[in-house]
Amino acid sequence: MSNVMKVSFEEGEIKTPDKAHSSTVKLGNVTMSKTTLQPGWSWSSCIKPIVGTESCQAGHVGVVIKGEMKVKHDDGTEDNFKAGDAYYLAPGHDGWFVSDDEFISYEFTSDQKDFGPWKKS
């Protein structure tokens, strides 16, 4: 791997489910996603019909750039994430808009993670 690398999110793998746009890029063993969600988006109305689970089963580590979202975990824990917040979400949650503006976040995962939902056996 080069000591200096760069890739544009414009060159990433694009996904566009209802009211969402996500671009995912990979640098070495780190995967990064930029996600933009439009007002009216919620996991339960826009993603649940696609994946068929009762809640989101992915873990997330990221930072909010714009907007605000409320998240409720299956265990009843709730919180709001807004611009400037770094966050961790364990699998088993729902999320929805609480602002009138688009929501933009960047998320990070690594093949080398040893915590949270990526803990190695």
Residue ranges and their predicted role:
Residues 39, 110-121:
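Glyoxalase I/VOC metalloenzyme domain signal
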Residues 73-93:
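Short acidic-glycine-tyrosine-enriched beta hairpin
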Residues 1-36, 44-45, 120-121:
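A short, N-terminal "cap"/entry segment at the start of jelly-roll beta-barrel domains
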Residues 28-33, 39, 59-60, 65-67, ...:
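A generic structural signal for short beta-strands and their flanking turns/coil linkers
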Residues 42-43, 67-72, 95:
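Short beta-strand segments in beta-sandwich/barrel cores
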Residues 49-75:
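Glycine- and acidic-residue-biased ligand/ion/polar-headgroup-sensing regions
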Residues 90-115:
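Ligand-binding loop in jelly-roll beta-barrel domains
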Residues 24, 32-36, 61, 78, ...:
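Conserved hydrophobic/aromatic beta-strand scaffold that supports enzyme active sites
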